[in-house]
Regions:
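C-terminal transmembrane-helix exit sites in multi-pass transporters
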Residues: 61, 132-134, 149-174, 316-342
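C-terminal-most transmembrane helix of multi-pass membrane proteins
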Residues: 311-386
């Protein structure tokens, strides 16, 4: 009898140790994913600003024109696809695309379109409907409102996937949302936006919803679907399908939308004859592709709420790169962020830190700070495959 009791105690102890190690592995995986997301925010911040590096020459046309912006996005998608083709190895990449024979895989294409080409169209419309006091369009406020996809993703995770967020996360999300809305209202007043611009702001919120839907849908497909796609498969299928759509219809539709012929949209590709223009856009595509790969690694490891929240760090990195470009005297004029921008952004960055540290904070509150730090860095045995 005594031997049986001792055996049961040893088995229970082994089970408890295994559960503790599994918990530590899960926490580490989430934290590592969040780090990937934070790094991806750096790349996503610099890519849009790279157009300022291109010398202002007549042959390029207006670099700020929608058709040029659409061309930039199209090349980004193509270069990102090429990067993944090389990085994941051609054979693996082709095998990823073969998954399209499964109906479930087409959901990746759908969510990719919603968070890619469709979102871009809605954002362009929101900019066109946002009118400043001079009668021109203004994309500042719509761009700020896109960041509300974080709260949409958190609410969506809670409603549809019964995800549980800690009090730290909800508090930081609520504060961030208020700050983003406050900053948007401040900019709207400062720029003297017309009341008719409310329509554009509503479209920006719809666009934010599309980004949240992409994060939620892709996360579900990678964790709970029948196939359980890897992040490599998901990001490759999403990017290549978006590249094909943008290549076929991106610039032509943008041309038609702005009163040019459908075929005029393809003429923009002639700009590749100007090497400085081409090299910068190709480099932007590689940076964007690398950032997207990190973003999807974060999505599969940490979930949609943490992933979208890491992108709030773009509020910090974008002005930092603006200051760098100003100091480097890039060919095009870069506007310096206003003083009140930082009044809103510093608390948002702090909230991003709180959300990103949530897993560690919750765990530390249960086991103590010393043990939590020890578990974060101590070497643990590899997980048994038995």
């Amino acid at each position: 009898m005594a031997d049986q009791v001792n055996t049961d105690q040893l088995l229970q102890k082994e089970k408890n140790v295994k559960n503790e190690l599994d918990t530590i592995r899960t926490k580490r995986r989430i934290i590592l994913g969040i780090m990937y997301g934070l790094i991806s925010a750096v790349g996503y911040s610099i890519v849009p600003l790279m157009l300022y590096i291109i010398p202002e020459k007549v042959p390029y046309g207006n670099l700020a024109a929608p058709i040029n912006a659409t061309f930039y996005v199209t090349v980004q998608e193509i270069m990102a696809t090429f990067l993944m083709f090389i990085f994941y190895k051609p054979k693996n990449f082709i095998n990823f695309l073969k998954l399209l024979r499964h109906k479930e895989t087409w959901l990746i294409v759908l969510y990719g379109y919603l968070g890619g080409p469709v979102a871009m169209v809605f954002f362009q419309l929101s900019v066109l409907l946002t009118i400043n006091h001079q009668g021109g369009t203004d994309g500042t406020v719509p761009g700020l409102l896109l960041n509300l996809n974080v709260i949409f993703a958190a609410v969506g995770s809670t409603i549809f996937f019964r995800a549980r967020q800690s009090k730290y996360t909800w508090t930081a999300l609520a504060i961030s949302t208020c700050l983003i809305l406050g900053m948007s209202i401040h900019f709207a007043i400062e720029e003297g936006l017309a009341w008719s611009s409310i329509g554009g702001m509503c479209l920006a919120l719809v666009t934010a919803g599309f980004y949240a839907m992409e994060a939620l849908g892709m996360s579900h497909l990678m964790s709970s679907s029948k196939i359980k796609f890897t992040n490599h498969e998901t990001v490759s299928i999403k990017t290549s399908s978006s590249a094909i759509l943008m290549l076929l219809l991106g610039t032509p539709v943008a041309a038609v939308f702005f009163h040019q012929s459908f075929w005029d949209g393809y003429k923009i590709f002639a700009n590749f004859q100007y090497y400085d223009y081409a090299l910068i856009i190709l480099a932007g595509g590689i940076i964007m592709g690398s950032s997207r790969m990190l973003y999807y690694a974060c999505l599969v490891m940490s979930g949609p709420t943490y992933t979208t929240s890491t992108q709030l760090l773009m509020f910090f990195w974008t002005p930092i790169f603006q200051y760098i470009f100003i100091a480097a005297h890039v060919p095009n004029k870069v506007s310096e962020p206003t003083w009140y921008y930082w009044v809103y952004v510093i608390p948002i960055v702090f909230c991003t830190f709180i959300i990103s540290s949530n897993e560690f904070l919750v765990h530390a509150s249960k086991v103590g700070w010393k043990r939590a730090f020890h578990e974060l860095f101590v070497k643990i045995p590899k997980q048994s495959t038995k």
